[in-house]
């Protein structure tokens, strides 16, 4: 997917949904309308009842996503330095060791992590990206923020390979957690394929600004 060709409305739509659902998978209670207010206007409705931490968990997605987009536009490969940058953005004002791999007995856990190797077909590429996500979450290289970071860098790889973004909705949390726990990459592929097909339709609807189709997809 060429980010430059995306409309601003669809770019913001991806960002809002990614922030809402990715944070929601970790227990964030901020609603989708409140997420729109945070991402677009930088304000949190007083009626939301959200904590300061929840606000930053949402707001930090904006700087992380925009950094990711900048790297992708420059056609930069996903190196460990970029992963650390994205983690630092997502955990800004939330943890003291942002952007740093955790250490146990002087061993850097993140050193075990490697990004997906090149693959030939689209299915091979998608399978490799999903498997890398499973392994990233298994390793848990950071002290906190692994879920949000893992999903962001998974989308980095997907967008770089021409796929739509994979936004895992918080309503699918039980299935998603099960897929990670069992490391069932084939079932994850089936789950992701259906979700990506839906996202492709949403992208097309945004390009034609067909509001009725957008509502149907939702």
Question: Where are the regions a protein language model picked out?
Answer:
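FIC/Doc superfamily catalytic core
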Residues: 1-218
């Amino acid at each position: 997917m060429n980010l430059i060709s995306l409309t601003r409305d669809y770019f913001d739509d991806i960002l809002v949904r990614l922030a809402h659902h990715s944070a929601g998978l970790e227990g964030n209670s901020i609603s989708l309308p409140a997420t729109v207010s945070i991402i677009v206007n930088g304000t949190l409705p007083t009626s939301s009842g959200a904590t300061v931490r929840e606000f930053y968990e949402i707001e930090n997605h904006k700087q992380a996503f925009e950094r990711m987009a900048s790297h992708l536009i420059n056609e930069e490969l996903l190196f460990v330095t970029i992963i650390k940058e994205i983690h630092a953005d997502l955990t800004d004002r939330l943890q003291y060791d942002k952007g740093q791999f955790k250490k146990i007995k002087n061993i850097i856990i993140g050193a075990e992590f490697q990004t997906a190797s090149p693959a030939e077909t689209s299915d091979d590429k998608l399978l490799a990206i999903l498997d890398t996500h499973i392994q990233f979450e298994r390793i848990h290289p950071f002290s906190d923020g692994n879920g949000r970071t893992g999903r962001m860098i998974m989308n980095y790889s997907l967008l770089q390979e021409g796929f739509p973004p994979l936004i895992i909705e918080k309503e699918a949390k039980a299935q998603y957690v099960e897929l990670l726990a069992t490391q069932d990459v084939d079932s994850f592929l089936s789950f992701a394929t259906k979700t990506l097909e839906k996202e492709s339709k949403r992208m097309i609807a945004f390009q034609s600004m067909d509001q009725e189709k957008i509502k149907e997809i939702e």
